[in-house]
Amino acid sequence: DPLYISTIGINEKTLSLYKYMGYKVGYLNHYYIVNTHKKDFRIIGNFDGHFHNETLRDKSKRLIRYDKAELLSLCNDNGHSIRASNVVPKKSFYFFYQRFFCHPIYTYSIYGLFQYDLLLGLIALRVIAHNTSRVLQIVDYFGNAAGLDGLIDGFQDLLQEYNAEYIDFYNIGLPSDMLAKSGFIMREHSKKRRTLPHRR
């Protein structure tokens, strides 16, 4: 029997069935950071001027993009690892390579999260375009949650590089205070003042 089963996007009509079978069901948390260099927003609705959570900046951390060959080389290098022994589920470099660089439909970018020369985590990112506007979506992160602390400058650099309105992140399990320390704002379901479209 597997130790861990999860899914997203289940039909609301089947929620009672999953609850009856003993599964925990709920909603993913939605976090975002807005590009501080943007003044004209075509995707965000009713922007209130709150770009990101105020947080300390950790200048020792940076994001480095991996191309396909570089990530594949990590798959064969036992000297590289991510120190995330307490993270569930377990993922490997090869998982990221197969899942994101070999996807038959979508194009993803993979970034290594480094503190100095130590690899703390991997981030999978997708660019979503609508007319002339772009947003970035983190679709996967593997690593220690604390590795994201102080990374606001790295996320703002990505937003400026892609000329995107915002970067967002749906997840459950990562502590909200940890994500706040990386600059992310948690979107409240009850608040209508800012609109961030849900995308498939």
Show where each model-derived region lies.
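Intrinsic-disorder/low-complexity loop/linker signature
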Residues: 1, 59-61, 117
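Active-site/acyl-donor-binding loops of N-acyltransferases
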Residues: 2-55, 115, 122-149, 153-200
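A conserved beta-strand-loop-helix scaffold within acyl/acetyltransferase catalytic domains
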Residues: 7-12, 28, 64-144
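Short glycine-aromatic motifs
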Residues: 23-24, 60-64, 69, 108, ...
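Conserved N-terminal entry element of GNAT/NAT acetyltransferase domains
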Residues: 43-74
